[in-house]
Amino acid sequence: MSIVTDTFISTNQPEYHSHFWDYLMGKEGHENFLDLGRNAVGAYAPPTTSSKKFEDKLKAESLFRQLATVHYAPNGPSSILAKVNTDSAEWVAPGGTINAYDAINDFSTYRLNDHKLAVVMQLDASFLHDNRYIFESYVTGRLVKDFSHAEECGFVNGTGKNMPTGILAENGGAEIGVTADAITYDNVIKLFFSTKPEYRKDGVWMMSSETALAIRSLTDAAGQPLWNHANDTILGKKVYISEYMPGVKVGNKPIAFGDFSFYRIVERSGVTIRTLRERFFETDQVGYLAFELLDSKLIRPEAIKVMQMTA
């Protein structure tokens, strides 16, 4: 009598979890039980519980995943519709004519691309042997660091070519609210009021530590500081620090203010991982290729305004 082993184990099953992490530790044969998590290039989706841990840690580490709007669309359309804010309501006299309004004009179409963010890392075989019980948490934490830093750089400075379109992109990025030759009290105020009230309502500031240090010393004519040191706000709006924002140099855009929820991150594929045993065999290491597919765009450029430095 032959025994048939079912290799089609769902990613949310405990068996898949065990086989997946044994596979990553370099043990032979376990990939045969991961068929339902395998993609077209031979990488495997992490178990459901591990994916949840990764996503939660990535959100906690990633500034933009906290401020932006994130969608997961692995098999979705190649474009998204974004609503344009149009005031269409009007007062009508009793018995008066109500003007028809074509709501299709409310939407703009943005094409999505599958930009690949990838990392290759390697671990000594001795590390795998001696640290079996912390292996999952170590790999998860390291991937979170790698991906969160690369994502933030792309979400700020991405050009849209082989990477997302960042908020500072020349095409598709935030609108310029103020041009200035220096960061002054008045110029920061001008940037704030260059945004429409609807975007100021939930607006936040984003800048580097260097720029924040310069602003912390700004005061008005009466000596009142612009920066509220008690809660790290400017004009009542929270300040977020990103070291991927540029410094105060000619041509740079060191300060952004607005509603970052209009920056959309669309995940086309979650993180998948495959081992690279042969590549690092001679050094007694196991290599890993991990990657994700995503795109991101500022669907309403006027929602975020930036200060651009001039000579």
For the regions a protein language model found, what residue spans apply to each?
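Short helix/loop capping segments that flank catalytic or ligand/cofactor-binding pockets
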Residues: A82, S88-A93, D130-R132, A214-S217, ...
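Hydrophobic alpha-helical segments involved in membrane association or supramolecular assembly
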Residues: I80-L81, G141, K201
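Bulky hydrophobic/aromatic "packing anchor" residues in well-ordered structure
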Residues: I80-L81, M121, V239, Y288
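Residues immediately flanking
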Residues: K83-V84, L123-A125, S209, A290
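Extended oligomerization regions of viral-like shell subunits
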Residues: K53, Y72-A73, T159-D295, R300-A311
